[in-house]
Amino acid sequence: MNADVVIVGAGPAGIFTALEMIKKGSRQKIVMVEKGQPVEKRHCPKDKTKKCVNCKPYCHITTGFSGAGAFSDGKLSLSYEVGGDLPTLIGADLAQETIDYADQIYLEFGADEHIEGLGHEEERKEIRRRAIQAGLKLVDCPIRHMGTEKAQGIYLAIERYLQENGVEMYFGYECSNLILENEVCKGVAISDGKTDLEIYAKHTVVATGRRGADWLEKLCAEHNIAHAPGTVDIGVRVEVRNEVMEMVNRVLYESKLVGYPKPFKNKVRTFCQNPGGFVSQENYDNNLAVVNGHSYKDLKSDNTNLSILCSHNFSIPFNQPIAYAQKVGELTNMLANGQILVQRFGDILDGKRTWQKELAQSNIRPTLPDALAGDITAAMPYRAMTNIINFIQAMDYVVPGFAAYETLLYSPELKFYSNRVKMDTDFNTSLQGLHCLGDSSGWTRGLMMASVMGTLMGRKIAEEG
């Protein structure tokens, strides 16, 4: 099969590549390959089964059209300071300009016009003052919250728009390899387990998301595509009562706090805050169970959850950060019999495990009821655990009650975007004809910045004709 552009991965980066080409009037043939299912066929059975059933061949939360982010929460960060290192490659001004442009596209397809995190100047100053006292930095970032259920409708509208405008989509097909001729990428080989296909194209865009970060890292090694080990984030999902987070939830919606706690001074940050939200489980390759969180526009819980992530940057000779994070996750899963572990913060400080009956005695009712009470410190590396404990205690200055005895910590929370593919400002890799976008490229983190990268890629291809 021949095409002008083949896009591997139907997450925000891949979607916005195709979307921008169409908006620029390009008539080039676009083929999109996605190993998951279309939006309308993505359903997590846990709502009925009340526990994860390890869907095969892939978890519907992490795989399919719109990627993992849209099914976890659907938050669009509207500041270039949030979402990865892409601004260092393309420049802050272009990054912010394209964020504003992509945001308008989301609005066109039905995103809520309300923006969280604006106004409340005096209360924002008070939160910042507390953060400074605690040795933390508060990052200003307005948020457009689509919500898990609303995001699905928005991406369904985008999916249909792309199909109506001639984009060919191959769902259930996985990319097995690149097609190379004389050190030039000519396309991809794909398979659905029964049928093998080869798609030849002038431009091959790989945008496989966090789910595909490990696969892309191996591909780079196999084909000698210039890349470098990047950062991997290891942490926990914290859950507290809404009353504890009331001021931050109302004023900021999402508190973006960054610190460098002693003694290691690694970067530790909050991420993906969900007021009235729900803790969730995602399954990656080899049934690796990872915790996440999401919130709906309408359905609300009594709790707020957010992740606390510790960034790891390894030095020579170690160059397998993704494998390292996976091992941490596997060990935690082993202790929890394949499930997510949950522990009270006070029990961690007391050096004891948490028992299921103790959870029932707390003010907090876990929103991930099948998480197994236990001891996350038995699997979490000392460095990461120390950083997390010290960061939570610093957070208590900003949000009194955050470090309460009954505060819940779920593990493991892992972010697989560590491989950094070396590219120029037009997203050309060292392999001619190949472009790598989104979280799997190591340059972005989250829906909006991946959308920005796709927009710029689509614009460039359309201009070339």
Label every PLM stretch briefly.
Residues 102-108, 118-121, 127-136:
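Extended, charge- and Ser/Thr-rich helical segments
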Residues 56-57, 64-117:
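Dinucleotide-binding Rossmann-like beta1-alpha1 core, especially the glycine-rich loop
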